[in-house]
Curated annotation (Swiss-Prot):
Organism ancestry: Bacteria, Pseudomonadati, Pseudomonadota, Gammaproteobacteria, Enterobacterales
Role description: Part of the elfADCG-ycbUVF fimbrial operon, which promotes adhesion of bacteria to different abiotic surfaces.
GO biological process, one term: cell adhesion involved in single-species biofilm formation
Other facts: The operon is cryptic under classical laboratory conditions, but is functional when constitutively expressed.
Protein's name according to its UniProt entry: Uncharacterized fimbrial-like protein ElfG
Annotated gene: elfG
Pfam families, sorted: Fimbrial (PF00419)
Signal peptide limits: 1-28
Family membership: Belongs to the fimbrial protein family.
Amino acid sequence: MQIIFGEKCVSLLRLFFAAVLMLWCAQTAAYSGQCHTTQGNPYIGVNFGVKTLEEEANTAGVVKDKFYQWNESNDYYVSCDCDKDNVRSGRWAFAADSPLVYLGDNWYKINDYLAAKVLLQVKGSSPTAVPFENVGTGGDTRWHICDPGGQRLGGQGASGNSGSFSLKILQPFVGSVVIPPMALARLYECYNIPAGDSCTTTGTPVLVYYLSGTINSLGSCSVNAGETIEVDLGDVFAANFRVVGHKPLGARTAELAIPVRCNTGNAGLVNVNLSLTATTDPSYPQAIKTSRPGVGVVVTDSQNNIISPAGGTLPLSIPDDADSIARMNVYPVSTTGVPPETGRFEATATVRINFD
């Protein structure tokens, strides 16, 4: 009985030591090196203000290198998943990406007219175009980088605080393009022990870059000289709104003659598109939603083809530096087939002009 008990004890001890060794191995391999911001300002505003493109630059494919450069001095604290007992043997590495649509060759789509190529400066390396991964910067001991509270980084020399972006024209535009604040790029940081250049765009970014600004074009076109057009559709009997998508009996069609003028400096005809934008009626999306449920407003071209309020276009070819006319028709329709309550109704729409 005692010998058997002894063998059981030996077996249990062996199993116990094996479990301890396996746990110790798992702990030594658990550090990812990935870093995150613990406090401070992790956002860099890339606001280039208001800039104007010369006429020859407002052409598809034109690139404006280093359209805007920045050199900020954000202060923030970074903590990394690393072994604080071996912090002196570590190395910094970086990665970056963008949430914008990737067009290839490091270009990201800002909107239908513009694209950006972003270069970020990390310490010890040349400016690198986004996206990138596994960019090492050599040894740079930070004693508290593995602590939960993190290590303070800051000043204009800190990695990621400086950079630039180039601008590419995807298609020419008229007037102004306003870029509201949008996430342009994200920088990820790693501290690898033992020293290595491994770093990917996973986890939480250390810095996020927000782009904003306004770009003006010297070439310009205008619709009704930029003034508001008011359309009076008169009085209609509510009982006549009975067929979805149809103009009620007795309703009038307003025929609009809208002045259009372009001054682009180009000889010959200018090809333009008038685009219509408004809130669509959920019951009949081809109509503009009005303040009166069951009543919508339809806009057509001169051939009675409906122009969708969700970005429908009216193409025109007009002479440069001369007055021209765009013709549209406007009339009310039923959107539900149910006669609406009596009363006034209103609707608004925006007409934007683009040229090739």
